[in-house]
Amino acid sequence: MNDKERKPWVTASDVAARAGVSRSAVSRAFSPTASIAPQTRERVMAAARALGYQVNLIARDMITQRSSMIGVVTAGFENPFRARLLSDLMAALGQRALTPLVTNAEDPRQVRQSLEQLLSYRIAGLVMTSASPPLSVAQQYLEHRIPVVMINREANLPGADVVVSDNAAGAVQAAQRLVRAGARRLAFVGPRGASYSARSRAAAFEQALGRGDAFGATLARVLDTPSDTHASGIDAARQLFAASERPDGVFCSSDLLALGVIDVARSEFGLRVPDDLCVIGFDDIPAAEYDAYRLTTLRQDTRGLAHAAIDLLADRMQTFDGPSRTRVVPVAQVVRDSCA
């Protein structure tokens, strides 16, 4: 199709003419917070649908001097938990008529450049779901008075708000569940050095075992992995079960790690789950339900995390100044066959 054949864009003036309203009424109809009679809004929307009208967000933001674009920084798109969280974030932003600009923080060499590029879009806020971007980059946004909300990251950036899952409560529940199942030599597996969430879960798990919640169980091994992937779980399991005294209960900081541990325990060491080994994960990804695993886990409420984050962001977009706030979202224990 050449330029002469390309269908011209429908304008707000076209919609106004068809609906029999003013141009400004069309603008108000597409602004969720604007004052406009319901019947007028519906007439405008009907005309827009009939004509195939789409709001020019860039033009609207330039006119109003208020951006509707929100930067979302994430990593590990192949990770089922992060994919679900990203989906819920998109939905939460859409409910507030905000437009996400997603940046992949997987490659540390490109993170800073990508984050700095977001500044050129004059975004209205930033949501960080990955541990990869350095806080110094997020600090740049705060200096431009752009709100920053971090999900499952440590609350150590003044002015930024944080939403986290209740890692401590989940870890204590994992310790208690393992002990009730009869496990006595326990191990923790997770990327403590690279992940705030794994670090928090490991610390709470260790504290639970040390203060009497464990009823005689001991923490035999804490294994720091490079990541929270299935491959890291495989490597960790080989180290754990090659030792002279194997653990009989393992708490993993993610479900993917737990699935890797189970695979190796069965295929390479002939262990039966849960008869010889109890395993608990964290996240409740779809694979945790598979018959091959039936993984007991702690479910993170991705919808709750997403909505809490966007609520904080929207509030900060209205009133930027104020102390940092932290919201803790409960987790839910899901009991399946791997540790009943």
Language model segments and positions:
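N-terminal helix-turn-helix DNA-binding module of bacterial transcription factors
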Residues: M1-S67
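Alpha-helical recognition/docking segments in bacterial nutrient-uptake
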Residues: N2-K7, Q65-Q176
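Hinge/beta->alpha junction and helix N-cap segments in small-molecule ligand-binding domains
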Residues: L57, A75-R84, V102-Q110, R153, ...
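Short, well-structured alpha-helical segments in soluble
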Residues: V111-R122, S232-E245
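Periplasmic-binding protein-like
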Residues: R122-S130, A187-G190, L223, S244-S254, ...
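Short acidic capping loops at alpha-helix termini that bridge into adjacent secondary structure
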Residues: R185, A217-A220, L271-D276
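Flexible loop/turn connectors
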Residues: A243-A340
